[in-house]
UniProtKB/Swiss-Prot annotation:
It catalyses: a quinone + NADH + 5 H(+)(in) = a quinol + NAD(+) + 4 H(+)(out). Pfam families: Proton_antipo_M (PF00361). NDH-1 shuttles electrons from NADH, via FMN and iron-sulfur (Fe-S) centers, to quinones in the respiratory chain. The immediate electron acceptor for the enzyme in this species is believed to be ubiquinone. Couples the redox reaction to proton translocation (for every two electrons transferred, four hydrogen ions are translocated across the cytoplasmic membrane), and thus conserves the redox energy in a proton gradient. GO terms for molecular function: NADH dehydrogenase (ubiquinone) activity; NADH:ubiquinone reductase (non-electrogenic) activity; quinone binding. It is a multi-pass membrane protein. Signal peptide: none annotated. The gene is nuoN. It comes from Dechloromonas aromatica (strain RCB). Its main location: membrane. Its EC number is 7.1.1.-. This is NADH-quinone oxidoreductase subunit N.
């Protein structure tokens, strides 16, 4: 029975194995340790993530390595995205600490364990080379997030948001699975590299493939939160506890980018003309509806939700312009610009939601725009940090957000005259988007505060928020640090 069994190479998946083991151990330890502040659970969670980063460094070979019967791949792209993922989740956990302690219904060990399992799901997605691996990682992430959104059981809004997220998430998973089944029916394989080989070989029913591709792109669009599959984003961002909104609004974007590259670029590049046409529509609609709807919002979390939709639409421009008329010479430049954009957005989003968490306290959620009136009078330093984050999101020179937009736009322009209209549309909607970011700056600096008490926050929170804001500014001066990392990782992975 076991004559043909081959022991897989476990080394490429060592960080995933370590994280899964530690998540289960932390769950058991949390039951045994009596600690109302969950300090032990928090510290173990952070050490686990740092341990994952150390293992990732130690086991990285820089080569493309397949294991588990080619279902799992380890390459430089996955290494880089996972390292940014660990860093993001560590920051998210630090930002969330005070908020979670102040809310009894959330101050449980399960919060940290669910965050670890969600991280594990993202790690699996980033390294997936098989439809089933993608689906397993996606469901592990989604189920963890559904539970995290519903953790504040005292809030009807949170419960409602969790239900909407669950129902629409199940629908998206169904679309993705149906698309995968159609592509499997046409190619006879579930392996992403195997699908690419079959398509290059020819003799595949293209009508079935394109039909499957439509469902696949719809499922991916939901996970990215782009129009018209964005319905869940505003309600979930606003309804979820702010610490969970921070988690949803940052780390999963890295995993979503990875599966777009794995599925569309690694697997279905021969169908580029078909999926590019779909992504152009999704991108333009997302930039239009995201930016225009954000203007009307009075709730900062909801405004940032529509902002996220527009940012993901902008990111898709880089994916769209990778292959032009069958010519892939611009692919590395285009895809690395999108990767840089996603990493920049995650950094900016983490800092912005971190500011909301710092201003929130027990019984008070600092999520209305009016809560930021006169912040400069209450805390000039943190008003300055928020200003840098808003300027960066708006794409004001010389912050990281500006260079993220600039790198994508130059990739679009380099693709040729046929794409020039896309660059013009992107610039126009970026200018419209600048309005609602600058409105926050106006409220902080030119309106009178309703509450003039100085802003108080723990020292570790103050240091981390300050570092986050300064990173947005410094990486705007030296963007080539991350740009070159993205380009090199994709050069060695595609």
């Amino acid at each position: 029975m076991f004559d043909n069994f081959v022991v897989p190479n476990l080394l490429p998946a060592a960080p995933e194995i370590f994280l899964a083991t530690m998540a289960l151990a932390i769950l058991m330890i949390d039951l045994l340790v009596k600690d109302s502040r969950r300090t032990v659970t928090f510290v173990l969670t952070q050490l686990t993530l740092i341990g994952c980063a150390a293992i990732q460094f130690a086991t990285s070979t820089g080569e493309i390595t397949y294991t588990f019967s080619n279902m799992f791949v380890d390459d430089l792209m996955s290494d880089l995205l996972k390292l940014f993922l660990y860093m993001t989740v560590v920051i998210v956990m630090f930002y969330s600490r005070g908020y979670v302690i102040d809310r009894e219904s959330m101050n449980k060990g399960e919060y940290y364990v669910l965050a670890l399992f969600a991280t594990l799901g993202m790690m699996v997605m980033i390294s997936a080379n098989h439809f089933l691996t993608i689906y397993i990682g996606l469901e592990l992430l989604s189920l963890s997030l559904y539970a995290m959104v519903a953790m504040n059981r005292d809030s009807v809004v949170s419960t409602e948001a969790a239900m909407k997220y669950f129902v629409l998430g199940a629908l998206a998973s169904g679309l993705l699975l149906y698309g995968m089944s159609m592509i499997y029916g046409a190619t006879g394989t579930l392996e992403i590299t195997g699908i690419a080989e079959r398509l290059y070989g020819g003799g595949v029913n293209k009508s079935v493939l394109v039909f499957g591709l439509v469902f696949l792109v719809a499922g991916l669009a939901f996970k990215l939160g782009v129009v018209p599959f964005h319905m869940w984003i505003p309600d979930v961002y606003q309804g979820a506890p702010t610490s969970v909104t921070l988690f949803i609004g940052s780390a999963p974007k890295l995993a979503a980018f990875a599966i777009v590259i794995r599925l569309l670029v690694n697997g279905l590049i021969t169908l580029a003309a078909d999926w590019q046409a779909m992504l152009v529509i999704l991108s333009v609609l997302s930039m239009a509806i995201g930016n225009l709807a954000a203007i009307a919002q009075t709730n900062l979390k909801r405004m940032l939700a529509y902002s996220a939709i527009s940012h993901m639409g902008f990111m898709l421009l880089g994916i769209v312009t990778g292959v032009v008329g069958g010519d892939a010479r611009y692919a590395l430049n285009a895809y690395s610009s999108s990767m840089f954009y996603v990493i920049s957005y995650v950094l900016m989003s983490a800092g912005t939601f971190g500011m909301i968490l710092m201003m929130s306290r027990a019984g008070f959620e600092a999520e209305e725009l009016d809560d930021y009136k006169g912040l400069n009078k209450r805390s000039p330093w943190f008003a300055g940090i928020m200003l840098m984050l808003m300027f960066s999101m708006a794409g004001v020179p010389f912050f990281i957000g500006f260079f993220a937009k600039f790198s994508v736009l130059q990739a679009v322009v380099a693709a040729g005259p046929g794409y020039m209209w896309l660059a013009i549309v992107a610039v126009l909607f970026s200018l419209i988007g600048a309005f609602y970011y600058l409105r926050v700056v106006k409220l902080m600096y030119f309106d009178a505060p309703a509450d003039e008490t100085p802003l108080s926050a723990p020292m570790d929170m103050r240091i981390l928020i300050s570092a986050n804001g300064l990173a947005v500014a410094l990486l705007g001066i030296f963007p080539q640090v991350i740009m070159s990392l993205c380009a090199y990782a994709l050069l060695r992975s595609l």
